[in-house]
Regions:
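Membrane-interface "cap" regions at the ends of multi-pass membrane proteins
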Residues: 1-77, 81-89, 195
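Hydrophobic alpha-helical membrane-associated segments
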Residues: 35-38, 42, 67-71, 117, ...
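Hydrophobic transmembrane alpha-helices that form the core helical bundles
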Residues: 70-149, 154-157, 162
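Juxtamembrane helix-boundary/capping and inter-helix hinge elements in multi-pass membrane proteins
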Residues: 53-56, 82-88, 96-102, 228-238, ...
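Helix-loop-helix junctions that connect adjacent transmembrane segments
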Residues: 10-11, 15-16, 58-59, 136-139, ...
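Hydrophobic alpha-helical transmembrane segments in multi-pass membrane proteins
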Residues: 36, 40-44, 61, 65, ...
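Juxtamembrane loop-transmembrane helix junctions in multi-pass integral membrane proteins
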Residues: 19-26, 53, 97, 101, ...
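Select transmembrane alpha-helical segments in multipass membrane proteins
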Residues: 23-33, 59-60, 99-112, 144-148, ...
């Protein structure tokens, strides 16, 4: 009887008896979220957005997109701290707040979206890597993407522990790439070029088209929710890791 009374007195978000996970905030939420946010859109399409919208409108796009991600993160934190979060990711949270019908419908869409995003990211990886080989082969990006998918399948087959270790390698490469970007911008600073690129291009497809191209870059913060079943304390790790990932990506 005392055991049940103690369980009922625990805060909803702090119950870890059913979590059964081993990952903490950094490995389980922050790392997968930040790796998805700073993904292929940032490296392959941000230049296109800046070149067409200009730096001024690009900053507005960043402000609007990140405002949406911050508000969504607040909602996610409110749900995670008021429920006993278990495995199931987005489906679990939505089904417990809006009902199983909404949870099932949205869960299927999220599953398909994440499946397609794997191919999308691998194709982007192949597109970026193909020019390094100087091979006159039109399907080389697709070949590289297929090899990347096979490589990721092996890690998924081995389990979450191997995938968690590998994501640290990816993060190290990502941090190096971003640092080189900032170092290059400081060393090659050109005020005249900044003024020239501030306004939008006459051939720009429009603000909302460019916003739609860039917006998927800020949606990766929900990736940590998918790891809810592997977290030691989902009620604490999900809001902390999500806010940390969104904050770092904004900076």
């Amino acid at each position: 009887m005392k055991h049940h009374e103690m369980e009922n007195n625990l805060p909803a978000g702090s119950d870890t008896s059913d979590a059964g996970g081993t990952l903490g905030t950094f490995a389980g939420v922050f790392t997968p979220s930040i790796l998805t946010i700073l993904g292929i859109i940032l490296f392959l399409r941000l230049g296109y957005v800046v070149g067409n919208a200009g730096l001024g409108l690009t900053l507005l796009i960043l402000l609007l997109a990140n405002s949406i991600s911050v508000l969504t993160s607040v909602s996610l934190a409110a749900i995670a701290t008021n429920l006993k979060v278990k495995g199931g990711g987005d489906y679990y949270l939505i089904s417990r707040t809006l009902g199983h019908e909404f949870g099932g419908a949205i869960g299927i869409v999220v599953f398909l979206a994440q499946s397609v995003s794997i191919a999308f990211y691998c194709l982007g990886f192949g597109e970026a890597l193909a020019p390094l080989f100087n091979a006159h082969l039109s399907i080389l990006p697709q070949i590289i993407a297929a090899l990347a998918v096979s490589f990721l399948f092996i890690f998924a087959w081995l389990g979450a522990d191997w995938a968690t270790r590998f994501q640290y390698v990816v993060m190290a490469v990502l941090v190096t790439a971003i640092m080189s970007y900032f170092i290059g911008g400081i060393l090659k600073w050109d005020s005249a070029l900044l003024v020239q690129n501030w306004s939008s291009s006459p051939t720009s497809p429009g603000f909302w088209v460019l916003f739609a191209i860039f917006f998927p870059a800020v949606t990766g913060f929900t990736q940590g929710v998918s790891m809810s079943g592997d977290l030691q304390d989902p009620g604490r790790s999900l809001p902390r890791g999500t806010f940390l990932a969104v904050g770092v990506s904004i900076i």
